[in-house]
């Protein structure tokens, strides 16, 4: 196994450059799945904690009404029923499900990434499509929507020891034993633990350390320049490339053709680009390498204006935060309002009934409370106060409408029943308006799917 430390360092540098994107995606994912009080804040005493802890310290009970998840379900449901139903499908990859989950990732992070390979798996020899998490993907800074400015990309992968041996032993028993020993040493030096079932495996992933019992593999594709000969065969009309060391082979072929009176192959030296793939272990050992005309990844970043990535979820996070704060404020107001407080004058306690018995009988059906009435003084009274109209409900309605306006997902797209008096034409118009608002996202994702299908 050769050493490729320089190429591993280049992959690591590219991975570190994507730290901001991964942190942004993690925040959006948390908001999507309900962890909406996890942003870090600084307390007045200088302590740093998440918003949930800060609100509890201040006496609030943080409330959450997850509207973002509902929006995504509506969009994905529309995609499944109206768009994906007419798409290419196969029995091997279950593309409808893969594409739905990729769309969900696209809405959350603004990134849609898949890997298409032709290989043998448990399902047989086929062209396989795999979802690649942006948390495991690395790529140089790109600004071209078509990906023509990509120079390095790849992913970090976790494989079982058996899979590593199967993929990289190349039919050599000694190499298989060397691979087992190599990764056994790496596992002994690591300190990663297993991930609980149902928990995220990518939230705090590192570049070099694999989960317990797994082997970390870094797959890196670099665009390199290579010397080649551009050839033209007059006999067949084919134009093709030969390796840079094929000059003698071409000359010998032409000598043979000259003796037979056949047209000679025309060739000239040229420089071209090819993708150099390397599978590396965390210590820089090269497990396998190959050259290819194209890399196996298909990706789409949205909207990629000046290279920036912004997702659908990012647009509605602020409205979601406002809704949560209003719900928390309303809960605080209601919890601090007097609700059935009993005012019992101290000088009216009955000798034969304690204050505890009086409180219990007051709340009991058909209860009897004894007290000593005082001339000119009111008896025990129950106080119920109303918090009053502070405008919280109106502000909450405003934020809910703003979420519809910002996201473009209205009641018609959600499948909600039409309100009383609404005509069918108006309801259909609202549905079409929602679809038009999301057409840019659907269009961007459709170009991604088309590019993927061309690789199948």
Question: Where do the PLM segments sit?
Answer:
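Core catalytic machinery and nucleic-acid-binding channels of phosphodiester-processing enzymes
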Residues: 319
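His/Asp/Glu-rich acidic catalytic environments and adjacent acidic regulatory segments
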Residues: 316
């Amino acid at each position: 196994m050769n050493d490729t430390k320089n190429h591993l360092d280049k992959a690591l540098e590219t991975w570190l450059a994507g730290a901001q994107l991964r942190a942004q995606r993690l925040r959006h994912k948390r908001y999507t799945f309900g962890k909406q009080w996890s942003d870090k804040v600084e307390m007045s005493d200088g302590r740093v904690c998440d918003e949930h802890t800060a609100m509890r310290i201040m006496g609030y009970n943080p409330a959450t009404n997850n509207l973002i998840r509902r929006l995504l379900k509506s969009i994905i449901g529309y995609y499944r029923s109206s768009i994906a139903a007419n798409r290419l499908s196969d029995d091997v990859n279950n593309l409808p499900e893969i594409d739905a989950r990729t769309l969900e990732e696209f809405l959350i992070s603004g990134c849609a990434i898949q890997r298409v390979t032709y290989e043998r798996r448990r399902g047989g020899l086929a062209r396989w499509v795999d979802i690649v998490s942006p948390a495991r993907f690395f790529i140089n800074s790109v600004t071209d929507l078509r990906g023509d400015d990509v120079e390095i990309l790849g992913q970090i992968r976790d494989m079982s020891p058996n899979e590593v041996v199967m993929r990289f032993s190349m039919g050599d028993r000694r190499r298989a034993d060397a691979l087992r020993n190599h990764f056994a040493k790496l596992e002994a030096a690591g300190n990663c633990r297993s991930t609980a079932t149902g928990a995220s495996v990518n939230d705090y992933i590192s570049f070099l350390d694999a989960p317990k019992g797994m082997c970390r593999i870094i797959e890196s594709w670099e665009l390199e320049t290579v010397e080649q000969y551009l050839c033209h065969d007059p006999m067949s009309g084919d134009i093709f490339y030969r390796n840079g060391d094929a000059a003698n082979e071409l000359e010998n072929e032409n000598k043979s053709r000259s003796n037979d009176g056949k047209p000679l192959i025309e060739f000239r030296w040229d420089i071209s680009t090819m993708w150099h793939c390397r599978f590396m272990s965390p210590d820089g050992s090269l497990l396998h390498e190959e050259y290819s005309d194209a890399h196996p990844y298909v990706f789409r970043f949205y909207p990629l204006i000046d290279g920036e990535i912004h997702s659908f979820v990012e647009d509605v996070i602020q409205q979601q935060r406002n809704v949560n704060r209003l719900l928390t404020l309303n809960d605080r107001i209601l919890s601090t309002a007097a609700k059935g407080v009993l005012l019992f004058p101290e000088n009216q306690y009955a000798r034969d009934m304690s204050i505890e018995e009086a409180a219990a009988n007051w709340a009991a059906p058909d209860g009897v409370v004894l007290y000593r009435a005082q001339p000119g003084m009111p008896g025990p009274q129950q106080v119920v106060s109303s918090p009053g109209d502070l405008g919280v409900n109106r502000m909450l309605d405003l934020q809910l409408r703003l979420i519809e306006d910002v996201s473009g997902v209205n009641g018609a797209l959600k499948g909600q029943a039409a309100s009383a008096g609404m005509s069918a034409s108006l309801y259909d118009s609202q549905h079409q308006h929602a679809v038009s608002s999301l057409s840019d996202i659907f269009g961007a994702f459709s170009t991604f799917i088309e590019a993927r299908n061309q690789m199948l």
